């Protein structure tokens, strides 16, 4: 497996938190925090994919690389596929890692962990999950659960993703973390597929891959990064990063 290419899709048109990638956290735009964490993962080159000049400018001002993509992509995966062809048209990278641009507190170590399942040639897509500890999250439809069985140390094979509380019975529930490592061929196949029945019902893009028979494995990690979707999330991220700076 060649060095992975890390791509960070970032767009300004968020409904709940406008201009989210440029939101100030400790004097630095949020997208810069995410880019720095991805660089610190140390697994391969990092590129921000955006449809907005302002986002590209703040990354390039700090010595990073950004590429401009079309503004009309229906999903982050489609933006990822376009950016991959711009950055690596010769196919030198056979793995691409999609790090969401709204994870400013993400631990670089879990970005590095995300590619581990791809050492198994049967795995098409790799992702992450963490044990749910807070009871209120178990029934929260905004907390996506992964249902799977153990295939190795701290590793699950995904059988389903759902917003419902699942699976039933004793044992841990797992919070899916929306970070993906794709084989290049798997990404090309994925974005060419039509939306699946379960994908449309659950509003979960990854179900398209499972419905098509693609294999997704997940590493179980301890750190659950904060996804910034609302003004309240942004304030929490500011607090968390301020504490880290003090320590």
Curated annotation (Swiss-Prot):
GO CC terms in record? cytosol
Q: Recite the UniProt keywords alphabetically.
A: Cytoplasm, Lipopolysaccharide biosynthesis, Nucleotidyltransferase, Transferase
Q: Its principal location?
A: cytoplasm
Tell me where it resides.
Answer: Cytoplasm
Reaction catalysis annotation:
3-deoxy-alpha-D-manno-oct-2-ulosonate + CTP = CMP-3-deoxy-beta-D-manno-octulosonate + diphosphate
Q: Name one GO biological process term.
A: lipopolysaccharide biosynthetic process
Asked whether the UniProt record includes Transferase among its keywords, one would answer: yes
User: InterPro entries annotated for this entry?
Assistant: Cytidylyl_trans, KdsB, Nucleotide-diphossugar_trans
Keyword Metal-binding among UniProt keywords: no
Q: What is its EC number?
A: 2.7.7.38
Give disulfide pairs as residue numbers.
Answer: none
Pathway membership, UniProt: Nucleotide-sugar biosynthesis; CMP-3-deoxy-D-manno-octulosonate biosynthesis; CMP-3-deoxy-D-manno-octulosonate from 3-deoxy-D-manno-octulosonate and CTP: step 1/1; Bacterial outer membrane biogenesis; lipopolysaccharide biosynthesis
Which branch of life, at top level? Answer: Bacteria
Q: Which GO terms describe its molecular function?
A: 3-deoxy-manno-octulosonate cytidylyltransferase activity
Pfam family of the protein (one): CTP_transf_3
What does the function comment of this entry state? Activates KDO (a required 8-carbon sugar) for incorporation into bacterial lipopolysaccharide in Gram-negative bacteria.
UniProt lists the family membership as follows: Belongs to the KdsB family.
**What name does this protein carry?**
3-deoxy-manno-octulosonate cytidylyltransferase
Q: Write the gene name.
A: kdsB
């Amino acid at each position: 497996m060649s060095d992975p290419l890390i791509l960070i899709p970032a767009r300004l048109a968020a409904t709940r938190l406008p201009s989210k990638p440029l939101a100030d956290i400790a004097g630095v735009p949020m997208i810069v925090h995410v880019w720095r964490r991805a660089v610190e993962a140390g697994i391969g080159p990092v590129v921000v994919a955006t449809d907005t000049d302002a986002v590209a400018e703040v990354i390039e001002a700090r010595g990073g690389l950004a590429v401009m993509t079309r503004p009309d992509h229906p999903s982050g995966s489609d933006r990822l596929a376009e950016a991959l062809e711009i950055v690596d048209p010769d196919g030198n990278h056979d793995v691409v890692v999609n790090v969401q641009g709204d994870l400013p507190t993400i631990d670089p170590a879990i970005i590095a962990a995300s590619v581990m399942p791809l050492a198994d040639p049967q795995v098409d897509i790799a992702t992450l999950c963490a044990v749910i500890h807070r009871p209120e999250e178990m029934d929260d439809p905004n907390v996506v659960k992964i249902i799977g069985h153990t295939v190795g140390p701290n590793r699950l094979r995904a059988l389903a993703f759902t917003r419902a509380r699942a699976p039933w019975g004793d044992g841990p529930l797992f919070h899916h973390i929306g970070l993906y490592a794709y084989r290049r061929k798997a990404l090309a196949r994925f974005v060419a597929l039509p939306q699946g029945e379960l994908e449309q019902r659950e509003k979960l893009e990854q179900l398209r891959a499972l419905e098509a028979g693609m294999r997704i494995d997940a590493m179980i990690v301890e750190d659950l990064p904060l996804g910034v979707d609302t003004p309240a999330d942004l304030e929490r991220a500011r607090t968390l990063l301020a504490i880290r700076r003090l320590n």
